[in-house]
């Protein structure tokens, strides 16, 4: 088995140290480490993190391989420092049966760039009327633990209650896309001053907040776990904070783009900024950052949503919603959270590895950088500065809102169970 020494890295941003990888496992952590025949990576000034975990990725396969495949999506994940991603269920066919989630799981095994944990649909066909085969998906080879109709809201309170009751039996979690559909009909962007000035249909904050309020109450009533996808408003933060103060089993995520971008960008009418939930106000952005820093929001999730060029190269109203995010997520978090002093690199490890792995009950990921642990690791150069060039993306799609924007930090190496998937910033 191969041996690798990562020398002089700041482990979780702390003091410099060495890590010896032997095969698939971290063999030793210390200083001045040596091993016969080991490959040495000089990592002075770099940050060593546990491999990143994404709770919210759209890999599009099966059905929309024109925008992404499991192979290209996991390549993008590795470049971004991720060693595990959760693949959302809004594929064609929908991942609402054991057969489809096992197909996605096997494609992930074959890709080899990161682990793929399928997310099962809550309802048949994402139609919100009948529970999908939750138990069968959990008992399948894919071992599904997270269920979501993401892209659509489980807006029927009875269906949501039944889903929460069902997954409680095996410690699963329902991840809710909080969007009251009757309040967002025809909506094109955040409802506010900018939407009024542009004459675009507004997407009110209460459409998100009302569903979150309902669902934290349902979760408390049932005694089950609920996870809120892509929190985007200050009001949503307050509801989650209140629910947590009650001791209820509620977790939440925020996307990198909601930590940085605002609805002012919609003035450009560039569809690259069209996303669900929409970009909100500066006040919302600041509230989300504070909530991620204080733990009200548990983790960062990319909501990586690739689209082919033609789905974005059109007028705003006709454009698809979504942004790619796997390859830029860590840089955006560094800019908005680390460089601003809101969290340190240990906080990044917590919000982008430990907590998402714990929420997804994902074995082997989100583990300490310690002897005996799986060698799922990410090495980051925080001093790097560079403009985002989507032409160099590993993802099949290019719909990034950051094209040409200078972002800090770069993943130099990613290790999946001791095997380098990224070396010097490039796929191995």
Show the residue positions of the predicted features.
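C-terminal cap of metal-dependent C-N hydrolases
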Residues: 315-318, 371-426
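A glycine-rich helix N-cap at a beta->alpha junction
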Residues: 106-122
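Divalent metal-coordination and catalytic microenvironments
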Residues: 9, 24, 45, 56, ...
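Active-site mouth loops of central-metabolism enzymes
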Residues: 55-68, 89-91, 117-130, 151, ...
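Histidine/acidic residue-rich metal-binding segments in metalloenzymes
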Residues: 131-300
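His/Asp/Glu-enriched, well-ordered alpha-helical/loop segment
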Residues: 197-225, 272, 293-294, 298-300, ...
């Amino acid at each position: 088995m191969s041996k690798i020494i990562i020398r002089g890295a700041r482990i979780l941003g702390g003091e410099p140290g060495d890590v010896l990888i032997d095969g698939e496992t971290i063999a030793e952590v210390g200083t001045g480490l040596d091993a016969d025949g080991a490959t040495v990576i000089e990592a002075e000034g770099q940050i060593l993190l546990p491999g990143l975990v994404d709770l919210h990725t759209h890999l599009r396969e099966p059905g929309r391989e024109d925008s992404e495949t499991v192979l290209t999506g996991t390549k993008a994940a590795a470049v971004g420092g991720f060693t595990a991603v959760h693949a959302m269920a809004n594929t064609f066919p929908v991942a609402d049966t054991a057969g489809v989630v096992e197909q996605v799981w096997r494609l992930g095994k074959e890709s080899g760039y990161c682990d793929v944990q399928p997310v099962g649909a809550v309802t048949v066909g994402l139609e919100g009327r009948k529970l999908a085969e939750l138990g069968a998906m959990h008992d399948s080879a894919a071992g599904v633990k997270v269920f979501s109709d993401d892209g659509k809201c489980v807006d029927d309170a009875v269906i949501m209650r039944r889903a929460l009751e069902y997954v409680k039996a095996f410690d699963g979690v329902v991840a809710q896309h909080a969007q009251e559909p009757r309040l967002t009909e025809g909506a094109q962007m955040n409802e506010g001053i900018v939407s009024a000035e542009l004459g675009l249909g507004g997407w009110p904050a209460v459409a998100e907040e009302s569903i979150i309020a309902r669902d934290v109450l349902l979760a408390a009533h049932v005694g089950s776990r609920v996870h809120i996808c892509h929190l985007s408003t200050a009001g949503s933060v307050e509801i989650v904070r209140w629910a947590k103060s009650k001791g209820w089993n509620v977790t939440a995520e925020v996307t990198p783009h909601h930590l940085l971008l605002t609805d002012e960008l919609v003035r450009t009418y560039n569809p690259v900024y069209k996303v669900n939930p929409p970009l909100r106000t500066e006040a919302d952005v600041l509230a989300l950052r504070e909530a991620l820093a204080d733990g009200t929001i548990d983790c960062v999730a990319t909501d990586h949503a690739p689209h082919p060029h033609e789905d974005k190269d059109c007028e705003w109203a006709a454009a698809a919603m979504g942004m790619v995010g796997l390859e830029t997520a860590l840089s955006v978090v560094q800019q908005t959270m680390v460089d601003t002093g809101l969290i340190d690199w240990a906080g990044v490890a917590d919000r982008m590895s430990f907590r998402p792995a714990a929420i997804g009950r994902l074995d082997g990921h989100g583990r300490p950088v310690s002897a005996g642990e799986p060698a799922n690791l990410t090495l980051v150069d925080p001093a790097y500065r560079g403009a985002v060039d989507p032409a160099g993306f590993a993802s099949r799609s290019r719909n990034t809102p950051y094209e040409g924007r200078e972002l800090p930090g770069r993943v130099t190496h990613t290790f999946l169970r001791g095997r380098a998937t990224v070396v010097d910033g490039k796929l191995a």
